[in-house]
């Protein structure tokens, strides 16, 4: 027992010596990283008995962060814009063929006219043996344009006689009778005036359109002497007629006069116009003079036939 107590103090002194050595080492090394200092403090604390056989923690290595790299997108490749004009053609150096050996015959120089030009849009075709070949395009000269212009038509007047129109063959052919249709004029005075005046043209030489336009002008022009206007004299009525019979029939509507009386037995109908009496008489006789051309139906009045024909057209 006494031996154990005497050997104990040297062991505690060794432990405290290690602690002092650790403190001195820590104070002398101020540049040690903070992580290693903390590990050493935890490993060799004065309150913990050091274990020389224990494994020490390896220092933690923190790799440095590389600066970020900016990756730019690839540059876009734009296609050249389309242009209606063709790109300029590079000039090809002229090719001169090798000189032929001298011959005994001399040929005259060939002159090319200035209107033969080279087309710049044709691509030359070359080979090892043949020189570059260019297609030639001839421009249209003034002579060609003059020949392409349409010929001017000469205005020819009709011949004075039919024999001249047929030429020399007219004497060999039989006589041809030229028939011109004669259209009656609406007024006899117009025909008399054309016959009396030598300067005016005859009615046969006028076209139907000219005669129709003249008739319409006579109807529309009330100041003409040939155009007679029959106006109604009843107060407040402004109707006008070209025929006196139409005016008389109109005046009977104002006066109430009905001179046309039906003579059928036991019939006392009276009318202001004669055509109305004729149409009324067909009711007694049963006459139907208006017949349909498409079917076998007959009608007593023309307006009834016109209405019936419209029904055929709609079917």
From Swiss-Prot:
A zinc finger (C2H2-type) spans 230-254, 260-284, 290-312. Pfam families: zf-C2H2 (PF00096). Residues 149-169, 182-222 are annotated as: Disordered. It comes from the Eukaryota. It is found in: Nucleus. Residues 213-222 have a biased composition (Basic and acidic residues). This is Kruppel-like factor 3. It comes from Caenorhabditis elegans.
């Amino acid at each position: 027992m006494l031996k154990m107590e005497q050997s104990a103090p040297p062991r505690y002194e060794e432990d405290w010596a290690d602690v002092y050595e650790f403190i001195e080492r820590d104070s002398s090394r101020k540049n040690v990283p903070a992580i290693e200092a903390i590990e050493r403090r935890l490993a060799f604390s004065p309150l913990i008995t050091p274990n020389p056989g224990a494994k020490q923690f390896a220092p933690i290595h923190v790799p440095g962060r590389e600066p970020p790299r900016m990756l730019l997108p690839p540059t876009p490749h734009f296609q050249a814009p389309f242009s209606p004009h063709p790109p300029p053609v590079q000039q090809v150096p002229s090719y001169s063929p090798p000189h032929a050996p001298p011959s005994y015959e001399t040929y005259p120089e060939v002159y090319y006219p200035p209107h033969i030009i080279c087309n710049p849009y044709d691509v030359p075709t070359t080979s090892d043996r043949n020189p570059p070949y260019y297609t030639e395009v001839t421009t249209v000269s003034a002579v060609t344009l003059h020949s392409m212009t349409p010929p001017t038509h000469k205005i020819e007047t009709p011949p004075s006689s039919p024999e001249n129109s047929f030429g020399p063959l007219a004497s060999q052919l039989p006589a041809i009778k030229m028939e011109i249709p004669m259209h009656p004029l609406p007024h006899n005075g117009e025909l008399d005036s054309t016959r009396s005046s030598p300067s005016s043209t005859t009615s046969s030489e006028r076209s139907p359109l000219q005669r129709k336009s003249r008739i319409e002008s006579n109807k529309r022009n009330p100041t003409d002497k040939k155009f007679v206007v029959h106006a109604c004299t009843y107060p407040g009525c402004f109707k006008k007629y070209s025929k006196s019979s139409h005016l008389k029939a109109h005046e009977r509507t104002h006066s109430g006069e009905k001179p046309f009386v039906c003579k059928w037995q036991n019939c006392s109908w009276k009318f202001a116009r004669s055509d109305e009496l004729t149409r009324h008489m067909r009711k007694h006789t049963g006459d139907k003079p208006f017949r349909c051309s498409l079917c076998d139906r007959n009608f007593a009045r023309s307006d009834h036939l016109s209405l019936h024909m419209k029904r055929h057209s709609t079917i």
